[in-house]
Swiss-Prot record:
Cysteine-cysteine disulfides: none
Domain HD residues, every copy: 23-139
Gene3D superfamilies in the cross-refs: Hypothetical protein af1432 (1.10.3210.10)
A family per Pfam: HD
Class of the enzyme per the UniProt entry, highest EC level: hydrolase
Record SMART domains: HDc
GO molecular-function term, one example from the UniProt record: hydrolase activity
Keywords from the UniProt entry: Hydrolase
Keyword Protein biosynthesis: no
Protein name (Swiss-Prot/TrEMBL): Putative phosphohydrolase YueE
Length: 176
């Protein structure tokens, strides 16, 4: 039995504040992609879904003359760093196991290479899943962050994903 559910994370005021900024519809879509990918890879779907749900909570909106400046964002982006820290703090506050909170935070930290110097990192499977889940929902110019979802629909999707994770966790899951 999980101590902290996706619904616990999703409904927390801190998560809501940052999910609203980065895009609730995108976060939920990524959580579903991560769930599916993690089940196929025999990786803990709870960790994958939580990391994907929270992967963009470090976003800061870059504007020039009142308009979203995607190029400025790409040049100055550190959202994965801020998001990893925010997610870790939130998960610990909610009672997540420290090791799980760290794994989730690291997956968030490494879901993008926009702030990293050139080169390749050796990412574990969970980290690769969160990156892929984000890529699967991406739209040109960052428009995926602006898709809308009704709050009631969002909650229903999170409830359903929690149920799917509980069912999947009934089987043996290898550690990350």
């Amino acid at each position: 039995m999980r101590k902290v559910t996706l619904m616990d994370v999703f409904t927390h005021p801190i998560a809501q504040k940052y999910l609203q900024r980065s895009g609730v519809a995108h976060a939920i879509a990524c959580a579903y992609h991560a769930y599916r990918l993690s089940v196929k890879a025999d990786i803990n779907p709870d960790l994958a879904a939580k990391a994907a749900l929270l992967h963009d909570i470090g976003h800061y909106e870059w504007y020039t003359d009142g308009k979203w400046d995607y190029e400025k964002y790409k040049r100055n982006d550190i959202h994965a760093i801020k998001g990893a820290e925010r997610a870790h703090k939130l998960l610990i506050r909610l009672g997540e196991e420290p090791k799980a909170a760290k794994e989730i935070a690291l997956a968030i930290l490494l879901h993008t290479d926009s702030y990293l110097p050139e080169g390749e990192l050796d990412k574990n499977t969970l980290q690769q899943i969160v990156k892929k889940a984000d890529e699967l929902d991406e739209e040109p110019g960052g428009h995926h962050h602006y898709r809308q979802i009704d709050p009631s629909t969002a909650r229903k999707k999170i409830e359903k994903l929690d149920q799917l994770i509980d069912q999947a966790q009934a089987s043996v899951i290898k550690p990350v």
